[in-house]
Amino acid sequence: MREYRFDVKRCFTPENVVRLLFVSGCILRIWYAVVTPVTMRGHDIWELSVNAKGKAAYLLRLVEWGKLPDSYELQFYQQPFYYLLSALAAAVMRGLTGIEDAAFLVNAGKVVSCIASCFSLYLSERLLREFCSVRVRGYGMAVLSFTPVFWLTGGRLGEDALTFFFMAAVILGTVEWEKQPDWKHSILLAVLYGCGMMTKISLAFPAFYTAYIFWKNRKSSRFIPKMAVFAVIALP
């Protein structure tokens, strides 16, 4: 009978360790989102009622009334993209289960945060792959996978997880555009910035890096038309 030996070095290569950290980080985020109610460690949730002025009310007004808040009071000043996606997720869950309880609908909205947090981890690994050695990528993924400030947002109702996703996406998109400044990458980057700015205004910060890369490559083919299309898509 052939003897089987477990080769630790062959199994736990640096690349496999990075993959393991990524999978572990995603499992942690999903587990936390499932077991933690939205009112625990939440931020600016307030009452689970359409008559309140917190993030829960923002979502519930979209689900129940089918429209954005009529004012910018308190948490109603937030950009709408995250809440539109969360309202869609909550409406789908309501349709599948028939449950119309406010707590259930608000908790269902966390699905967007959880998915965004997991995809943020993937995009972060892609960015680390661009700039770092495999050993440094391992350290970076360990920090991103298990530091509470990153995975807690995956179990909360709020735009933070989606904002981090778009920040990672636009930086990676800028890196890809610099390598291949074609129409496809220009339009994709513009869409990412447009959606990101509709999620949170702080997406303006990575724009400085993107502007620098654009300026470096201003002599590339058809630069002016690409920038015009980029502005038309991203700025509104």
Language-model features, listed with the residues they occupy:
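Hydrophobic alpha-helical membrane-interfacial segments at the cytosolic entry of transmembrane helices
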Residues: V17-S24, I187-L192, S220-P236
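Transmembrane-helix signature of polytopic, membrane-embedded enzymes
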Residues: L96-A103, S124-F146, F164-F165
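Transmembrane-helix motifs of polytopic, lipid-linked glycan transferases
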Residues: A103, N107-F131, A169
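Short acidic/glycine- and proline-prone juxtamembrane loop motifs at membrane-interface regions
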Residues: V149-T163
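Perimembrane helix-loop-helix junctions
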Residues: Y4, K179, P206-A234
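Extracytosolic helix-loop segments that constitute the early lumenal/periplasmic catalytic or substrate-binding loops
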Residues: I30-G42, W46-Y77, F81, A89-T97
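Membrane-interface transmembrane helices that cradle and orient dolichyl/undecaprenyl
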Residues: R129-V134, V170-S186, G196
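Short helix- or helix-capping micro-motifs
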Residues: G25-L28, G140-S145, L172, Y193-M197
